Amino acid sequence: MRISLFSGRGTELVLGLTSAIHKQPISAPVRCTFAGLEGDEQCDLRHHGGPDRALHYYPADHYLWWQTWQTALGLPAPRTPWQPAAFGENLSGIGLTEAQACIGDVYRLGEALIQISQPRSPCFKLNQRFGYGQLSQVMQLSGRCGWLLRVLEEGRVAP
């Protein structure tokens, strides 16, 4: 399975609210440390980052579902397109969703060894990013949240 890598720096999401949710594709090899991908930032360290939340994986498979959801409800286009990295993930791929992944599963990512540590608990920043007031709750109810990972062995990873 091919995994895409993303990283971001803190920027203003809305007036007075800084977030590193705006991730960009990584096109060259990067080091994966116990704190996450080198060059990636977390702004709210109370809720993001740390050894058990070093990386965030979101299944690319889900983006079509979100587009269908938006269309079915007749909602206007979101502020951010439904595409990988839109939910602030560091890792995304096709073929691995919540239906196959379990807490404790271990994966080799390049030279790094990573482990699923917990489900992602989406927050209000998604509502701001997409312009839909209840998006984080819809995400939780749909079960399409992705998950967080810890890094067991540091190493170089490449897109």
Question: What label would you give each PLM region?
Answer:
Residues G133-R150:
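A mid-sequence, solvent-exposed acidic-amphipathic segment
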Residues L149-P159:
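Well-ordered alpha/beta subsegment
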Residues M1-Q128, Q134-L135:
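Electropositive, beta-rich accessory/interaction domains or terminal extensions
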